[in-house]
């Protein structure tokens, strides 16, 4: 590694289906104003979802930019497939770090075009200070954790009722659709300054509208691409929240 870079963290990243990526190294340019960590190792996180960096809300700030490296061929192959294709122009991967303090922390991995015209894997810390200020001003009716629980329980009851009515809804295509759609909606709601009292109502409205939008694909048991679901959810959230 070039002498003007220092390793800041070494991350173990759970990406789903029991797969854990090791040796995800985060490096910062020497002379950075960030406080140096006491240890390079022991940091863990889990992949939440893919997003479009062009659609980050205005309150989402950036801090602590890193360059990412790895000696693991599996880790490099994963990020190459998820981020470094030319079609992934503005894609980002949201990672939730294992809590080390009262508030949660998130990293967003993305690509940048390097000086040698090759794409470089980078990431930054998602700065939520402005969102926390907005949340405090909104004076939520219910704690966020309880609302998340209500939304998940509501979705589980809905899926259970659908499965009782029609056994065909247990197909792999349907299950993947529901899981991906729920992931997109929950991620989109968390990345917006949505009043807590509207959280569950918005979730249901976007879920039902998305189901209607892809009714032909569901009827044919066709697999709906993640990017198509994300675009649909983002459009609906913009419509319902005017953001």
From Swiss-Prot:
Localization per Swiss-Prot or TrEMBL: Nucleus; Cytoplasm, Cytoskeleton, Spindle pole
Pfam hit, one: Sld7_N
Predominant cellular place of this UniProt entry's protein: nucleus
InterPro entries: Sld7, Sld7_C, Sld7_N
Domain of life: Eukaryota
One GO CC annotation: spindle pole
One Gene Ontology term from the biological process aspect of the record: regulation of DNA-templated DNA replication initiation
Purpose: Required for the proper initiation of DNA replication. Required for mitochondrial morphology.
Family label: Belongs to the SLD7 family.
Protein name: Mitochondrial morphogenesis protein SLD7
Species annotation: Eremothecium gossypii (strain ATCC 10895 / CBS 109.51 / FGSC 9923 / NRRL Y-1056)
